[in-house]
Amino acid sequence: MILYIFITTLTIALGCFVKNSRCMQTGQFGNPYVRNYHITNNGNTPKTKQTVQITSYKKNHITRRQGQNALCLFAIFIILFLLSALRLEVGNDYGTYVDTIHEIYVGGYVVTEPLFNAVSKLLCELSGGENYLLVFGFFGFITIWLFLKILYEQTENFAMAFFLFMTLGLYFRTFNTVRYYFALAIALYSYRYVLKKEYVKFVLLIAVTALFHKSVLVVIPLYLIANYTWKKWQIAIMGMGAVGLVIFQDLVMKIALELYPSYKNTIYLENGEGVLGNVLSIGRCVAVLILALLCYKEAVEDNKANQFYFKLNLMSIALYICASFLPLVGRIVYYLMSSHILFIPSILGQIKNEKKKKVLQILVVTAGVLYFLLFLKTATQDGVRVLPYKSWLFYEKEFLNAGEIF
């Protein structure tokens, strides 16, 4: 736990030095600089002197700010990547993945998606033998890089977005179900295509990602619905649909198991998550809803991206309450509520009243710290199990039995 607190504090401190300006977000290399040209009028009129400012960009010039950003981002990436890649027996399904990678390597039967299988097989072949550590490291590298890219390019306040990424536990959860969190990172990246209404690119990207984790396919209808301007009668239909999930639970469950048969006859069906099992996540969504409503006029109403995030949050609450009977409904909702790391900084950035902005920032930071402490308290429980942390640097044991309890 102390290690996680230290890593979180260190990386957040580094993140505070990253300033992602609009110029950088649009891909311009070099901040604008100004040259002053003095023009003197020597005509018949009295002599005058004017100064003309010409703003331009040096495309191949790296400014001090960009250098600082690059250095801090690189340091953050290395710290987070090493913590992920060096872990051993950390993660709720670590042993299951070890067994799966073994079966992939020897040509056995696995239920994982084809592109994940192909990449895992290739990595093992390149390393000269069965090497699940390399597979974990590879997906950790790509996933962390994607999240940092998203936070830098798709937010106006990297420091706040990264703070939420760490304190809401999203980074540490990537130690579990590496396929899922890789798919989640790409789903967040796809926001840029949804908001620009580049739907062909969006669908193609998600379709390819589904070859790593097919659950990501649910974002196609959900994101399209969230990006659509809702009319009152459509809201009524969606409300009836939410109620229908509760009334026709058995039918919905049957359809869900046909689409995802790997959950049949598993502990997930026996235990079920339920509303109480997701009370912390529901509370988080409600808190974000309250923040959005407090700033709706100035931060959400006329902001296309924030409208999109606002609807994703509403859908998260509805699914948590009305579809809690579904196995691992949290995985579906996480594709929606992970937008909080972009939504909250965007809301705060739109507030004009400095006093109100400062108060809300303090409340958000306080809530983030408390949420992180609650996350750490549950980090040893089944379904999370990212604590205690162990590294293969200090243990000779490499290969695990998937049925072993850590």
Residue ranges: model-predicted function:
Residues M1-F406:
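Terminal, non-globular segments
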